Amino acid sequence: MTDNCVSTVFGLLGVLAALTFPVTPGNAAEAQTVLGGKLVVCGVCHGVDGSPKLEGVPIIWGLQENYILKQLHEFQRGDRASDTMKKIAVNLTEDEVGPAAAYFATKQWPGPANASSSPPPTMAICEACHQPKLVGGVAAPRLAGQKYDYLVESMRRFAEGQRKNSPEMSGIMQAISASDREAMARYISGL
């Protein structure tokens, strides 16, 4: 995630959210019921329809609840680096983190992109944790259909030791070349 996504306008986040998040009876009621409107802030970067428009911002709709919960806690503790997400996550109470994770987990993953013709040879290792077709499971999140730019950046950060919240991923990504990681990201984003 780009750390300047919201931080330059953090004080005006409510205004941005109001302008960016279309208020309809359905989604306004859902957001109000779950977190008193705090979910509206998420839509500024992560997209109001589940498809982020900003570079480097991941799709979070439809991810596993336990994965979202883990990531929010890691942002709160500073175990996962992002100035923007830390500012947002620390403003969620423990009573709000669970409902936020549950809310996004119940949302429908955005429609698939165009799949590449064949997977790169390095893809086989991913299915061990991320499940066949990379739909995710208990131990690892869904990757299929995730944004290309987010995947490339996450893989790079794991490979360079900048993202430290999964030692397993760091080891795997360090063993894969940058060009192979890009090929993997291109394939995964098209699933």
Task: Enumerate the predicted regions with their spans.
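Gly/Gly-Pro-rich "capping" loops immediately C-terminal to redox-active cysteine motifs
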Residues: 35, 50-79, 86-91, 127, ...
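Bacterial N-terminal signal peptides that target proteins for export
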Residues: 1-13
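Inter-heme linker and motif-flanking segments adjacent to c-type heme-binding CXXCH motifs
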Residues: 51-52, 58, 81, 106-117, ...
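Extracytoplasmic/secreted proteins, especially bacterial periplasmic and envelope-associated proteins
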Residues: 67, 84-87, 99, 121, ...
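Bacterial N-terminal signal peptides
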Residues: 10-22
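C-terminal capping alpha-helices of c-type cytochrome domains
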Residues: 90-112, 149, 174-191
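Electrostatic cytochrome c docking/interface patches
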Residues: 22-39, 48-56, 96-123, 141
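The canonical Cys-X-X-Cys-His
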Residues: 42-49, 100, 123-133, 184
